Structures are given as C-alpha cells and as structure tokens.
From Swiss-Prot:
<keyword id="KW-0808">Transferase</keyword>
<keyword id="KW-0963">Cytoplasm</keyword>
<dbReference type="GO" id="GO:0008914">
    <property type="term" value="F:leucyl-tRNA--protein transferase activity"/>
</dbReference>
<protein>
    <recommendedName>
        <fullName>Leucyl/phenylalanyl-tRNA--protein transferase</fullName>
        <ecNumber>2.3.2.6</ecNumber>
    </recommendedName>
</protein>
<dbReference type="InterPro" id="IPR042203">
    <property type="entry name" value="Leu/Phe-tRNA_Trfase_C"/>
</dbReference>
<comment type="similarity">
    <text>Belongs to the L/F-transferase family.</text>
</comment>
<dbReference type="InterPro" id="IPR042221">
    <property type="entry name" value="Leu/Phe-tRNA_Trfase_N"/>
</dbReference>
<dbReference type="Pfam" id="PF03588">
    <property type="entry name" value="Leu_Phe_trans"/>
</dbReference>
<dbReference type="GO" id="GO:0030163">
    <property type="term" value="P:protein catabolic process"/>
</dbReference>
<dbReference type="InterPro" id="IPR016181">
    <property type="entry name" value="Acyl_CoA_acyltransferase"/>
</dbReference>
<dbReference type="GO" id="GO:0005737">
    <property type="term" value="C:cytoplasm"/>
</dbReference>
<comment type="function">
    <text>Functions in the N-end rule pathway of protein degradation where it conjugates Leu, Phe and, less efficiently, Met from aminoacyl-tRNAs to the N-termini of proteins containing an N-terminal arginine or lysine.</text>
</comment>
<keyword id="KW-0012">Acyltransferase</keyword>
<dbReference type="InterPro" id="IPR004616">
    <property type="entry name" value="Leu/Phe-tRNA_Trfase"/>
</dbReference>
C-alpha cells in the first residue's frame, strides 16, 4: 500500500512516481516549497503542485496523463473561420500576473473556490521573471478577455490554467499558442488531467509511464525560439521583433486560415 511522503525542505528529490496514490489519483507527496528549483525539478519529472487554501502543499502525477501534440491540433471549420475573422489581439508575456490572477478568480461551473493561492501566484510570477513560466493574453479593445499560462521546459509546454470572459477568446488563444509552439519545435503540451474542452482540440490520455518517457526525450531539447532575429509568423497580419526566451512578447491579430 502506497504511503504519502513528506518532502524535506532541504532536498529537492521526489519519491518515485509509481508510488503515487490511486485514490485520489496521482497524489504523490506533501510539503516542500514552491521555490523555482523545486518547481523546475517537479515539472521535469511530470509532477505538479495542486492544493487549496488551508491545505498543505500537495504534489500530483496522475495516471493516465492528458497530452496534446502541437503539430496535431484539431481545428474544425468553425474554429478556422473564427481564426480568420476574430476581433481579438493576442500577445505573449505582456500581462503574466493579470492572467494568473484572472485564472484564479474567475467563476467556474462545479468548482467552489480556487487552487491558485497567493503563494502559487507569487511562485509562478517568479518563474515568469526567470523565463520559465509564460502567459498568453487575449485582448478585446484593450481589455483582457482571455488567457492562459504555463511552464516551458525544453520542447514541452506544461499548461496550468486558462480563462475566458467572452465567447471564442480561449479557443483563439489556445489555437494560436499551439501553432506558435509547433513553429518553435515544441513536441508536447501537458494538459494534466482529462478535459472535454481540450479533447476537442485533439488532446488524448496516455499512460503515465509513456508520458515520462516523452519528458525524458524532450524536456532537455532546445526549442527554436528566435533570440535576436525578427520572427514572422504565418498566422498574424502584424508582428514585432521577438526578444530572447526570457520574454516571448509578440502580438497577433486575425490572420490566415490554419489547415
């Protein structure tokens, strides 16, 4: 019978993932901290923090794991039309804290409260400052109406949370992000647990062991993110020079069809 392990504050190592509980699925360890070093260590092995106010820090590695290949994103006819005609401007890393705050405060059906605590917000904001965590923002007439954030390690993007305040905002944002990740050579988007919404984009569940093998292959790869050169995306009608990886700042408006 598996038993939860309390993490040592001075030791970044996690217990083997096969020791995670089956009920609740994937609960692996308790305690530790949200330091950048521990978070990078955890994500590189497919482990992520998920807990609510009043709970101890909980670490998870569910089995199966839901993942999406950026190159295999499904875009139906309605979404392709929306991508050609949407009224939004999409940016990256221009309002990370605002996106994370919105993800933590927006009301969601079937959920009471949020798992995005102030401690979590501070930790991921620091990762963004370090160039490890990134956000995508969807704007409508200078108002933030949608977005998402996550962690980028090698050629894997670990999605954390998303929000939408108007119809179509999250679909446009997520689709554009996946296209950009594909252009940059990313192999995998970690969606953590099953979501019907993400399944509509082509996300699928795979065994945890398979997921971990994919991480071992791709977490240490170097993505094709431009550093000094001007990047021209096939999606937008406007773009601007892309700074180094520590700042993915770019902007899109409605553009060409995505096949």
């Amino acid at each position: 019978m598996s038993q939860l392990q309390w993490l040592d504050a001075d030791n970044l190592r996690f217990p083997p993932t096969h020791s995670a509980l089956r009920d609740p699925d994937g609960l692996l360890a308790v305690g530790g901290d949200l330091s950048p070093a521990r978070l990078i260590e955890s994500y590189s092995h497919g482990i992520f923090p998920w807990y609510s106010d009043g709970q101890p820090l909980l670490w998870w590695t569910p089995d199966p794991r839901m993942v999406l290949r950026p190159a295999h994103v499904h875009r139906g006819r309605t979404l392709r039309k929306l991508l050609r005609q949407h009224p939004f401007t999409v940016t990256v890393d221009s309002a990370f804290d605002a996106v994370a705050q919105a993800c933590g405060t927006i009301e969601r059906e079937g959920q009471d409260g949020t798992w995005i605590t102030q401690e979590m917000l501070a930790a991921y904001s620091e990762l963004n400052r370090l160039g490890v965590a990134h956000s995508l923002e969807v704007w409508l007439q200078n108002e933030l109406v949608g977005g998402l954030y996550g962690i980028a390690l090698g050629t894997v993007f670990f999605g954390e949370s998303m929000f939408s305040r108007v119809s179509g905002a999250s679909k446009v944002g997520f689709s554009i992000l996946c296209q950009q990740l594909e252009n940059w050579g990313f192999e995998l988007v970690d969606c953590q647990i099953h979501s019907g919404y993400l399944a509509s984009f082509g996300a699928q569940e795979i065994p945890r062991a398979t997921f971990e093998k994919l991480l071992a292959q791709h977490v240490w790869n170097i993505p094709r993110v431009p550093s000094a050169a001007c990047y021209q995306s096939p999606i937008p009608t406007t773009s601007r020079p892309c700074p180094p990886l520590i700042n993915w700042q770019m902007a899109w408006t409605a553009g060409e069809d995505l096949a």
